[in-house]
From Swiss-Prot:
Protein name: Holliday junction branch migration complex subunit RuvB
Pfam families linked: AAA_lid_4 (PF17864), RuvB_C (PF05491), RuvB_N (PF05496)
HAMAP family reported in the protein's UniProt record: DNA_HJ_migration_RuvB (MF_00016)
Domain notes: Has 3 domains, the large (RuvB-L) and small ATPase (RuvB-S) domains and the C-terminal head (RuvB-H) domain. The head domain binds DNA, while the ATPase domains jointly bind ATP, ADP or are empty depending on the state of the subunit in the translocation cycle. During a single DNA translocation step the structure of each domain remains the same, but their relative positions change.
Chain intervals for the UniProt region annotation (Small ATPAse domain (RuvB-S)): 183-253
CDD domains: AAA
InterPro entries xref list: AAA+_ATPase, AAA_lid_4, DNA_helicase_Holl-junc_RuvB, P-loop_NTPase, RuvB-like_N, RuvB_C, WH-like_DNA-bd_sf, WH_DNA-bd_sf
Amino acid sequence: MTDTDRLLSAGRRAEDVDAALRPRSLDEFVGQQAARDNLRVFIEAARQRGDALDHVLFFGPPGLGKTTLAQIIAKEMGAGFRATSGPVIAKSGDLAALLTNLEDGDVLFIDEIHRLQPQVEEVLYPAMEDRALDLMIGEGPSARSVRIDLPRFTLVGATTRQGLITTPLRDRFGIPIRLQFYTVEELERVVSRAARLLDLPIASDGAMEIARRARGTPRIAGRLLRRVRDFAHVLGADIVDAKVADQSLNRLEVDNLGLDAMDRRYLHMIADIYRGGPVGVETLAAGLSEPRDTIEDVIEPYLIQLGLIARTARGRCLNGRGWKHLGLNPPPEAGQDGLFDV
């Protein structure tokens, strides 16, 4: 199973792209209060100066609204919006074509910007700093450098792996913004808003039940809401309340902490086979038949956030909360090093 096959994957799927549900302004956008407040100031200041907004870098876990915020920036600035992704820009010529087709003030959004090729980054540096392209025309002794002026534009980059962005590129973003996981209360508002736009009657306790299991991620909350809607229609429920939501999510094997079968396999492997750990990530990856990157970037962050596991120098260990969630008692020696205190 790949990560995108999981119902609780925060990665983007075609079914998640619903323009009708997407917030269109900072006022409609739920959560990320500090980021929204700062963006509102930066956008208003740029408008008053009659200038383009400084380049923006959004970083944080997937599914938190980086693409949506980029589109909102363009709308609030009254600018055009162009979107692409790092892997798509294979050659420097591809980037040059994108940049030369921008209109004055446009927003260029590059998702997965950490995956840009080094030669493409070299073209991006003068474009970001000087609004110019330095291109080599011709080959050999007759080759010459030509500088092409570009219109004012705002580059909005998005990444889930900030550490993989090179320092020269990262330093050229004037507005770096980290997006955080959502609280359950914020996700309840996201679910209620989406249900209203889908014409789906939902009780506050039903929205809260979905929010609790959405792993702090609006994209997952929206996906769970759609699946709960399917169950509600088939069951003939007039309204999605806590009972309907709980029954539906249990059928989907999403437990009360928002863990799915893959998460529980991971926890059970540490508990049942390695007596709570420590166990190395390569061993876990082999046992689960998953790449190491999937373990480190997809499975573990949420488990660490919940305090179910700990990453130590010796490997991964199950914490007290992890044992409790599995309904198991730790072996006698497990509590001696203090790793398993709740």
